[in-house]
Amino acid sequence: LINFHTIDSVDDFTALISRINLVKARMDDAIDVARQSSQLGVVTPYFAMDGVIDQSVKIISGQPFDADSERDSALWAHIKRELAELQEADLIDKTQSAELESRARAALINSFAPAYEAIIAWATEARTSSPEIATGIGSQPGGADYYDHLLASQTTTDLTADDIHEIGLKEVSRLRTEMLA
């Protein structure tokens, strides 16, 4: 939202508020897809869940999410900066700025924060059944067939995944021998 939603007018700012209000529905959709994938055996590795949790916590840290915080969250600082710029450009007055700030705060607290809280809860729960060691696509349901499809559609080789794996094993052996010589 910060890097991709340009704000040059009041309409742009109200569109930002609309996007913030839609975050919860989109995150809920993403969680549903992740749960369905998990039921099919497609799971995210443990280390990735740690990143999801850590980044989500950081996104909803600071004002307006933490009432006692002395610092603004990155998104809240951005919103306040954009409102100040709209005022400086005489596109809004102080009353309009306060009203837009109030609407943005409500969207962040009532939609955005619960969306990230849901992501944190899902990732914390899913983490308990995530593999500690990342597994390749071949370990996923239909993964070997998918990998073969990728080889055929994304490369110019006629080699199979097994052929490429065998070449890799031979190269590792050759390089080890060369390094130890």
Q: What is the role of each PLM region?
A:
Residues 1-181:
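N-terminal maturation segment of proteins
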